[in-house]
Amino acid sequence: LLVMEGGAVAPDRVIETQVLEAEEIKDLDKIEEFEKPDEQIEDMDIDIPINSPNVSVSSDMPAAPNQPVSPQPQAFEAVMTVKSPVILKNIYGTTRNTGTRGTQLARFGGDRTTEDAVMRALRWLKKNQLTDGSWKNSKVAMTGLAILTFLAHGEKPGESVEFGETIQKALEYLMRVQNKETGRIPGNYDHPIATYALCEAYGMTLNPNVKVAAEKALDPLIKGQHPTGGWTYNMDPAPDKDTGKYRDDTSYMGWCAQALKAAQLAKLHHEGLDKAIKLAVKGFKKNAAPNGGFGYCGPGTGGLTSVGTLCMQLLGASNEPECKKGLQVMETWVPSFSSYGPLIEEMKKIRKEDLKENQTALSVAKSRLAKTVPPEERMFYTLSPQYYYYYATQCKFHQGGKHWSNWNKVMKPAYVKAQAVTKDAIKNDKGLLCDVGWWENADVHSDRPVMDTCLAALQLMVYYRYLPTTSKEAVQAEEEITATSTDTEDIKVDTGNL
């Protein structure tokens, strides 16, 4: 029931209510025996010049910990018995509800074509889920991304007839591979991505089992943060052995920061959460270039500008000069789904035996093309555009105005057109045959097409996944955690007393 501040019922308003009864979910005790994730995200080149975002999704990843993983979690209680799950404050608002998606689509530039593409993607993910609840190949990370994709559409276990069981199996997979004692989830990038998914899942379901897993996962993430504000691979808290300096990796920091923000909005508890959020702002500032842009492990102006800029927006620092300059650097960016075709063709010409020590086909192809590629084409001079544009699309959305409308005008039709579709491939909850759709860049990364499908679908749900960080609805929090807010500005983070 909606009440006004202080407890008084809002006058002269008709409030439509619905009695929610607990819905029994099938017994989930018989879960297939867990197999250790067999493949993890590979390393790719990251640090690149401006307008040529080529990114690494991961690097060397550790095996699963020696300690025993947590036992099978207790079966989910029907989440419909829990207080309304759509409580995420600030940028999340209540825009993922079925009744508000249409309004948000019209308000921010989405339409029937984008929503149809999203539904095809969700059905493709459902169809391609493995029996243990995961997605290949980097099973933990891809499962985290898939969960975030379903949640962005407002799909929840216990409520979504068509996708509820899919999400439930995915969440149970993450909880099953998590170390019961330490909270560690196997993998490198996998841990912060999975933590992000668990935190957001708790915020939307209030399920106590998910809460336990999310809070445990937060612990190694927060403890792995450097005094300088950043993170490095595997959340290693120690400085580099050779230089004695802390390696603050903007790409890795991006997933850590998103996980912290999701934890904050879900009101999860960790005594170090507030400080970690404030300190993370300093970490991104450390990697900001004086004239704008964010680098890999230090100041730079490359594709990671979108990562640093979005994270500063999400962490309440969009009015900081580093964030504003990052947006200026991105003014010349043009959205595109596809990898740069000539780069791929050039790589195909290079034989492995022709490579010298420390050379890769990618580095050689880049070097060759640098002599001929005109500057205006270098935006597409990348194998992993979706990694950068996942962040860039959100940056533009939060920036709003003509910046967003101009971006969306190009992004929306390009992404819808780029989706591959199989007709009548799966039945929906009503038994009707429906199409499935996916996205896949033309390179050889092992996590295609799951990663591309999730990142592209998330961009096509930006219209209702978030409220712009500059909107009045987004900035007025019920409980102000980091600092005070106003009706017109982002929540400000005080970074001066750490």
Predicted segments, located by residue:
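Intrinsic-disorder/low-complexity signature in envelope-associated proteins
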Residues: 2-119, 123, 127-128, 481-495
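Active-site-adjacent helical/loop segments in soluble small-molecule enzymes
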Residues: 418
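An alpha-helical repeat/solenoid feature that recognizes helix-turn-helix modules
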Residues: 80-120, 134-166, 179-219, 223-278, ...
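Active-site-surrounding "flap" and adjacent substrate/cofactor-binding loops of secreted or lumenal enzymes
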Residues: 164, 168-174
